[in-house]
Amino acid sequence: SEGRYLKCPGGAPANVAVGVARLAGNSAFIGRVGADPFGRFLHQVLTTEGVDTSHMRLDAHHATSTVVVDLDADGERSFTFLVRPSADLFLTPADLPTFHSQQWLHLCSIALSRQPSRDTALQAMQAMRSAGGYVSFDPNLRPDVWEDPTQIRPCVEAALRLADIAKLSEEELFWLTDSTELDSAMAQLMARFPLRYLFVTQGKDGVRVSTASNQCHVPCRPVSPLDTTGAGDAFVAGLLAALATLDTLPALDDLMPAL
């Protein structure tokens, strides 16, 4: 209600982990939260939702990331990050589990915004690929979080070089390619990076999907949005829950039921 704030669990990778668990998939959260009320709250919620939290570290020296999300009349959001730097950005290689073949690792660019999390995240992506697993990357750009904004593009590009699939908004795609034409921007990104799939979400207009040799558009049902927070994460969760049931990445036609 007006003048009140609601405490909600969140963070894009946590949202995806919960979404996968709700779709009867096996998911785990790798990361750090503060050993504080917000961190314990997130740990409790993820555990209750069926997410494996054995690799969620409670950091006694840094506070849990806390974000105020404001909504406009159309349900669109603005973000204010209250804790800088927060516990999640102090993830180290010692916090990473052993990865295995056929597993999926999903992450966003906030993990790249500061050391030591940046090198740890890139190391995790490489380790998952080396183990025979797959990597999903959603830039989910939040420039205000970055210690050095000039590092955003090179870090995002480094992650795209290690990803099997990527999910971007149109705005993120155009920013990365310096283009304003959707099909050519997608083709440009696919030519620059070794992605198997590129997904560009378009809100009420659905999603564009690209492989190295093909593109298609998948429309969505019309809805009246109340709050778009986590909508992209819900899309990724559904996609990964479906892909995780397969031994290999499918051809584009075989991917359609997941979209």
Where are these regions (language model features)?
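Short beta-strand scaffold segments in enzyme catalytic cores
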Residues: 18, 66-70, 206-209
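Short, conserved phosphate/pyrophosphate- and ester-handling motifs at nucleotide-, phospho-/glycolipid
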Residues: 20, 169, 232
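Conserved N-terminal subdomain of the carbohydrate kinase-like
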Residues: 26-109
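Conserved phosphate-binding/catalytic region of the ribokinase-like
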Residues: 126-127, 178-259
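Conserved beta-alpha-beta core of the PfkB/ribokinase-like small-molecule kinase fold
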Residues: 110-188, 195-197, 205-206
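Short catalytic helix/loop segments, enriched in acidic residues and glycine
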Residues: 2-18
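Alpha-helix C-terminal capping segments
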Residues: 15-26, 71, 242-244
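Hydrophobic anchor at the start of a short beta-strand
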Residues: 26-27, 53, 133-135, 215
